[in-house]
């Protein structure tokens, strides 16, 4: 019941976000039909009657509320419209690009978690040590510099100079055999996934360190140390478990960041995913595709909230019991 309630609370938020995105996209300058004519002048007619029919077909002259509900009805039935840039149904484009982005973002998220968690814990336990100072410097540098800068540096060092990884793309054409294809995909994945994941490590390390330090200063942790409980057990069983709630908040709610960050990383590495698709849709004023991509990001954000709630309850069941008693 708790998760059902949380899910139902997100439904009106979803519709509110859809209204905001739809209004913003429809407030942008430009005429979709004019854009379609510029992209494919041979396929578009100059006949005024035909243009009028097309405007009626796409509901371009309808009042904004009518346009919104017409669009919403189509979306809820699985019709996301037609891409004027790719000359293909939007839902087919998303279906073909989404798996590529999921592979990239999930790998990057796991890389970020694998690096940030131990570094943050060690930095908190060894407070004011050389390791802690070095970690702090690294974190501030990582937070200050943009992701595309790291991407370009990584390409120059590991692709151009060392030749360890491909410069761009997701696969090398002409390769046959399962293991050859698999290893080739991994080589293409390593660089963009590490760049996307390690950029986020900087901020995660700071949150993990701060959260764990607050718990390590609590009386019950000092009591455990005074009773002779081994350091590893105190940190993992007592301190880290109670420090996990704010850490979960950041790590779970940063999932949309990876999809947003993929927009830049996929563009730099020419990775054929949702980020690059969204970038191309925006710069080419492909309204149907741009709106659908933005709605996809909104859905990912809402799902991240549900994931965070689920992890909260796993770490501390009292959260669910507290909500029931409220």
Feature annotation, model-predicted:
Residues 1, 98-131, 147, 172, ...:
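Alpha-helical transmembrane segments of integral membrane proteins
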Residues 1-21:
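Hydrophobic secretory-pathway targeting helix
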Residues 10, 97, 101, 137-140, ...:
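Residue-level signal for discrete positions within transmembrane alpha-helices
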Residues 14-66, 162-182:
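Hydrophobic alpha-helical transmembrane segments of membrane transport/permease proteins
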Residues 20-27, 73, 138-168, 195-197, ...:
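Membrane-water interface segments at the C-terminal ends of transmembrane alpha-helices
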Residues 21-25, 30, 151, 155-159, ...:
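Juxtamembrane/transmembrane-helix interface segments of polytopic membrane transporters
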Residues 45-77, 269-281:
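Short hydrophobic, aromatic-rich alpha-helical segments embedded in or entering the lipid bilayer
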Residues 59-117:
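An internal, D/E-rich "acidic patch" concept
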